């Protein structure tokens, strides 16, 4: 019996409201991913693009400090609304948690949060969304790859 060739099928579920996704990643921490992601977002905005930035580093979010954002995002009942600063739409777990509270989450909680940020944030007609990834190859990277970014 001859078997059929294996074909991998992805569930196509891109980040809604965006045209292009740029994920900024590195296996090592402290190499400037967040700084680069922020500067890239600002540069694209200065070129006239509509830009958003998603801080996907659940354990060490830096977007609140880099953008000096000290507020919580609003919700329309089903989706979170990104916070707009410098004409850039922003979302981070750091907007939803207390800075002093340690994030002691396991895989399923991280996966759920990343899916929420990818699918339940009302990104408004963006040309680019910059995803600031955490270091390594863990749950966040796997989750984003499975939702076909």
Language-model regions, residue ranges each:
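Walker A/P-loop phosphate-binding motif and the immediately C-terminal alpha-helix
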Residues: 20-57
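Conserved small/polar residues in nucleotide/adenosyl-binding loops
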Residues: 147-149
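Phosphate-binding/switch loop-helix module in NTP-utilizing enzymes
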Residues: 97-143
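Signal for well-folded cores of large energy- and translation-related assemblies
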Residues: 19, 23, 45, 64-71, ...
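Extreme N-terminal, non-catalytic leader segments
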Residues: 1-27
């Amino acid at each position: 019996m001859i078997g059929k060739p294996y074909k991998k099928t992805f569930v196509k579920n891109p980040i809604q409201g965006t045209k292009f996704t740029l994920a900024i990643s590195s296996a090592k921490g402290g190499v400037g991913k967040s700084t680069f992601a922020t500067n890239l977002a600002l540069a694209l905005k200065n070129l006239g693009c509509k830009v958003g930035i998603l801080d996907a580093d659940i354990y060490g979010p830096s977007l609140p400090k880099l953008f000096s954002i000290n507020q919580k995002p609003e919700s329309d009942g089903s989706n979170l609304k990104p916070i707009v600063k410098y004409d850039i739409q922003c979302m981070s777990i750091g907007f939803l948690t207390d800075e002093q509270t340690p994030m002691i989450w396991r895989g399923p909680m991280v996966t759920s949060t990343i899916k929420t940020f990818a699918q339940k944030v009302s990104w408004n007609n963006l040309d680019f969304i910059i995803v600031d990834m955490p270091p390594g190859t863990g749950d966040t990277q796997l989750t984003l790859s499975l939702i076909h970014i």
